[in-house]
Amino acid sequence: IGSGAGGGIAARTLSKKYDVAVFDKASYLNKETNNETFGYHNFFEHYGLSATRGFGIQLLTGKSIGGGTSINWQTSLETPTEVLNEWDELTKQQNYFNSDSFRESIEYVIDNLGVSTEFNNIPLKEEKLAEGFDKNNIGYRVIPKNNSSNHGMECGFCAFGCGYESRNSSYKVWLENDDFNGDIYSDTGIQKIVIDNNKATHIEVENNGETSRIEVEKVILAGGSLNTPSILLNSGYKNPQLGRNLKTHPVSGVAAKFNEEQKPWYGSMQGMHSEDFLFK
């Protein structure tokens, strides 16, 4: 359930040996992406207006085949060692997240997504950021991205998909090619997972206003951090942790007046970053 960063690679891997079906309530991304209104209405959850209670923080969540990987800013940073150590400690997995096998999995994803700094078209706004870093003796580096070329970076609509197919989204990498031996059911919302004797036996889906039950052998629920807890609650799960402990990375806009015209929507959505203040 879900075709994004988690569901895409799981489906592709399992399809090598098993019959796999991917269900997603979203539609396929229209390659004609240069329309902001159309993009918000069709490629974002709640038209880009998902928010916390009281609307304190707006949450931009993808809603297309490929999930958030189809409309995100392509920033592809590896999990810091400090976080991996914390995961090992909390899960008591005996150094699993620092093991060679886990590292091999990370490298596999990096290689397939084409993560590198080669195709990061640094825009003028990022050059200004670098100037500020230099003046304040702050370290920084170019952000690795999961794109296969700089073609289309000038279009200015990277947040609404990629009409040039330069972005290596979950759909493009894991589900679109011939290595995926499964089926994709778009525009098919998951109402709940039917559980019998502690085993998932069916899923209830909605398509074109009609609800039906589909028999399943196994279910991987990868509907994103907002929708996964909702589906589990609708399915009757009572775990008190459901829907709790969501961590977000708040972003605050900074405006300034420059002598040169900036046009910040052109080029890479994010080009430079600093890690000097992490874990301090």
Where are these regions (language model features)?
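Short, hydrophobic alpha-helix immediately C-terminal to the catalytic nucleophile
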Residues: 8-12, 172, 229, 233
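N-terminal glycine-rich phosphate/pyrophosphate-binding loop and immediately adjacent elements
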Residues: 1-87, 94, 99-100, 238-257, ...
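Flavin (FAD/FMN)-binding glycine-rich loop and adjacent Rossmann-like elements that form
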Residues: 161-168, 260-280
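Glycine-rich loop(s) and the adjacent beta-strand/alpha-helix scaffold that form part
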Residues: 26-31, 36, 64, 188, ...
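Short, well-ordered alpha-helix to beta-strand connector turns
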Residues: 17-18, 181, 216-217
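Short, hydrophobic/aliphatic alpha-helical segments
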Residues: 45-60, 210-216, 270-277
